[in-house]
Regions:
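Basic, helix-initiating cap at the start of DNA-binding domains
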Residues: 1-43, 49
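C-terminal peripheral helix-coil segments that are non-catalytic and often amphipathic
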Residues: 2-3, 95, 128-139, 164-192
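HTH DNA-binding helix-turn interface
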Residues: 29-32, 52-62
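Short, basic, alpha-helical segments at the C-terminal edge of helix-turn-helix-like DNA-binding modules
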Residues: 37, 66-73
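Tryptophan-centric aromatic hotspots in well-structured domains and transmembrane helices
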Residues: 54-56, 159-160, 182
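Amphipathic alpha-helical segments used for helix-helix packing
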Residues: 59-66, 97-117
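Hydrophobic alpha-helical connector segments
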Residues: 74-103, 151
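Amphipathic alpha-helical packing segments from all-alpha helical-bundle domains
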Residues: 95-100, 114-140, 148
Length: 192
């Protein structure tokens, strides 16, 4: 009787982990232009064809590594108010993304423009964070703005100014954006 082979992605996950780890280490040490697929493959213990098959090219690999670095490790901070939650999310976001490392991560994500997969994942991280904040607001009896509107009013202007480097996106600017939001409507209490 033949044994059933169970493939839960173990080997695939190990390969991805090894390639990502080597790529991150090389990016920390070397200029991007000095990093090659064969270099990554050798240090990760895989063949270059494995990397090309999975990621297509080095730009897509950099984008995949950037997405992994940008993945949130926790839900947005719960401050007890929608404004506080948005501020606690937005200020560190702007600081991180406007740093040299953050700017490079943005460039890496945008390198994958052919498929848009990397950018889509990063965008979803933001929507997920705003959805958590909105759920908390509703639990407090508030009617929050839709996540799409928060992206348009908060995240989009920050990213625009980061990409075009035409102004600082520090705490004062982030608070100005927050001040421009319409007030969160309190849900009417239903008499029991």
């Amino acid at each position: 009787m033949a044994r059933e082979m169970v493939r839960g992605g173990g080997r695939s996950a190990r390969i991805q982990k090894a390639v990502h780890e080597v790529t991150r280490k090389l990016l920390d040490r070397l200029e991007r232009s000095a990093i090659t697929v064969p270099m990554i493959a050798e240090q990760a213990g895989v063949t270059p064809s494995t990397i090309y098959r999975r990621w297509g090219d080095i730009g897509q690999l950099f984008a995949d590594v950037a997405v992994e670095r940008l993945r949130p490790v926790a839900e947005p901070e719960d401050t007890g108010s929608t404004r506080g939650d948005l501020e606690a999310y937005l200020l560190p976001y702007a600081e991180e993304m406007s740093s040299p490392v953050g700017q490079q991560l943005i460039r890496d994500v945008l390198t994958d423009a052919q498929t848009g997969v990397a950018a889509g994942k990063c965008c979803q991280y933001t929507y997920d964070a705003f959805d958590v904040i909105a759920a908390r607001a509703r639990a407090r009896g508030e009617e929050p703005l839709p996540s799409e509107e928060l992206v348009d009013r908060l995240v989009a202007p920050i990213n625009y100014h980061i990409l075009f480097a035409d102004r600082e996106v520090g705490p004062a600017y982030c608070r100005q954006l927050l001040d421009r939001l319409p007030p969160v409507a309190r849900a009417k209490a239903v008499a029991a």
